[in-house]
Amino acid sequence: MAQDSKILEELYTVIASRKGTDPDKSYTAKLFARGRGKIAQKFGEEAVETVVAALSEGKDELVGESADTLYHLLVLWADCGVEPAKVWAELARRTGTSGIDEKKSRAKK
């Protein structure tokens, strides 16, 4: 795998390829087999662990937890059929817009 910004796309491709494969041979396949609720739960758990690492642990722990969080986010995207390019396009659309202005522009629910 690449050591640059393409790593997320490459990892996403590997993750997506695990969908429907033997859950006894792949942690990713096991997550897919357990369903979206479990995938979302794991993402949430990793996000919390990342916050804890940022607040009370060292940089190495934060890096590790961040990698876990990104991995589980990619699994969630793959399960939902969201490709990274869609997220990158949304980020690009928001580039150059203040966060305050961008938030105001969203439709109220």
UniProtKB/Swiss-Prot annotation:
Pathway: Amino-acid biosynthesis; L-histidine biosynthesis; L-histidine from 5-phospho-alpha-D-ribose 1-diphosphate: step 2/9. GO terms for molecular function: ATP binding; phosphoribosyl-ATP diphosphatase activity. It is found in: Cytoplasm. SUPFAM superfamilies: all-alpha NTP pyrophosphatases (SSF101386). One of its GO terms (biological process) is L-histidine biosynthetic process. The keyword Cytoplasm applies. Gene3D superfamilies: MazG-like. One of its GO terms (cellular component) is cytoplasm. PANTHER family: HISTIDINE BIOSYNTHESIS BIFUNCTIONAL PROTEIN (PTHR42945), HISTIDINE BIOSYNTHESIS BIFUNCTIONAL PROTEIN HIS7 (PTHR42945:SF1). Belongs to the PRA-PH family. This is Phosphoribosyl-ATP pyrophosphatase. The gene is hisE.
